[in-house]
Swiss-Prot record:
Binds the 23S rRNA. This is Large ribosomal subunit protein bL31. Belongs to the bacterial ribosomal protein bL31 family. Type A subfamily. The gene is rpmE. Its cofactor is Zn(2+). Part of the 50S ribosomal subunit. Pfam families: Ribosomal_L31. It comes from Acinetobacter baylyi (strain ATCC 33305 / BD413 / ADP1).
Length: 74
């Protein structure tokens, strides 16, 4: 096997915009990494998800096109 073909594996500090700091190891080649979201502030992980009500859109679509039917004969 060849020696020295693997990248250096070093400590990486990932800092989120919410202030959460995560220390991990990586072969990225940087000492710091800045994140927009992490598990501490992402809505999926915090349970603060917003459900979009698409039922109103579907009803509006059906109402708009309910008059059209396949009654056109050729």
């Amino acid at each position: 096997m060849r020696a020295d073909i693997h990248p250096k594996y070093q400590t990486l500090v990932a800092t989120c915009s919410c202030g959460n700091v995560i220390e991990t190891r990586s072969a990225l080649g940087k000492e710091t990494l800045y994140l927009d979201v992490c598990s501490a502030c992402h809505p999926f992980y915090t349970g603060k998800q917003k459900n979009v009500d698409t039922g109103g859109r579907i009803d509006k679509f059906k109402q708009r096109f309910s008059g059209m039917s396949r009654s056109i004969k050729r």
